[in-house]
Amino acid sequence: MHPTEVTSYCWPHHARIEGAGSCRRTTCSTATDNRQYVLTCRCVSAGGFWRPFGHYQGRLGALVTISHRDTDTVFIDELRKTCESTNINFLLGAGCSMPEFGTLGNIETLWAQLKTSETKERIANEHGDHANLIENIIEASLKASFFETAILPNRDYIKTNTKETKENYELFCRAAMKLVAKREASTLPKQVTFFVSNYDICMDVALDMARIPTNSGYVGRFNPLVDLSDFGRRVTTSTLTLGYQSEIASANLVKIHGCASWRKKGGGIEFSNEFDLIEEIERNIDNLCQTAQQANPTQDPGLQGGLFPLNSNTFNELIEQATTHAHKFDSDSVNKLLDSFKKLQIVWPTKQKFHDTVLDEIYYAQLRRLTNQLEVRNSVLIVAGFSFADEHIRKLILRAADTNPTLKVIILCYNEQSERDIKENLLSECNTIPNDNVTTVTAMKPGTGHIQGNLDLNTVSTLLKMVSK
């Protein structure tokens, strides 16, 4: 029996349990209509308490079947069988790069509110001639917070002692590649595709450290350019005497949102290890703050180290902060900082991704590649460190799960709270997953299994090692 944790917003009345064993079916009707719906239930205690294996929502009786599993031996055996016979894909989010890199929190939500016509009208009415400055300060503040969380740590990632994160990524890459290294059937490639929603260089460094042949989307050695045709190439080795060829395990690396190391060059984008742009942006942030301090020597502690500490949880608080500090900033310095942000070749975490970036073509191509991979028969997408707050990726994955019944989406959740947040994000998008092919996974409680505690990247690596045995 596998314990099931499901958020059930509307568990219908008049439910009737049928069948026997650890898995039963429930026929039920709602109080608002007389239609009959069938839900799968599993026993969650020795006393025979039953709970719906999925999510029932609303009067129309739509059923969302998001399965839950624990990292017990049965799940590990099933995952082993899945990986032996499928095309393997991973989706890695910001949670994998902690503690060196932070998560973005509610920045995307605040950004979306800034761009609404209602917000622009409100700022214009309240601040008149200073409305543009207030709006620019808010945008610069959000981008500065994002920069310090997701971009700035890349500069020192290679040089400084970030041993824990580097080792975790390298161990993960090695464990993931072992899933395909011993494959003998030519119908399945010895290849793993890694989709990364982060902006960091952690996977780039880890694949190099593990010496894994990688299709990374870069062409050239001294000044590598981003070339999206450089994917899917399989690596083989052959003997000199007999000419026998065998495939070597290789990886595809897809940076969906771009990378902190990408730079504009002519009509293309190059990969650079110089990080000079990051240093330029950091200088502009520091100069802006120093200018504010010089103009206001009695500055209150609300301006420390950056434009705003962004400890505001709501947009109203953010507007209040911007209004309070507006007189401290020179508009030219704010605009200079915003111009330097535009040089970053990344897809900013806004809901208007398709409208405010020069990377539209690359972004579309990366999403198409993710779509194409998930449409392949007998594929699995293993997700780690990703909250599904990203609207575009969330919709894409749910659509693929709907149209491809042979696809399995396995979401490795950091802890139970993370699982609840992920389910909430998924259920906000749709009210049915008819193929029952989306599963959330949490680790066993301490003392109850081999994989226990929180499913961070290191624990995920341990899980994959057990799967590849």
Predicted feature locations:
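Residue-identity detector for glycine
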Residues: 19-21, 47-48, 54, 58-61
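A short acidic (Asp/Glu
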Residues: 99-104, 203-208, 265-267, 391-397, ...
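Cysteine-centered motifs
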Residues: 10, 23, 28, 41-43
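SIR2/sirtuin-family catalytic core signature
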Residues: 59-90, 243, 311-337, 344, ...
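Extended, H/D-rich, highly charged conserved domains that either
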Residues: 192-346
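Gly/serine-rich nucleotide phosphate-binding loop at the start of the catalytic core
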Residues: 56, 61-224, 246-249, 254-257, ...
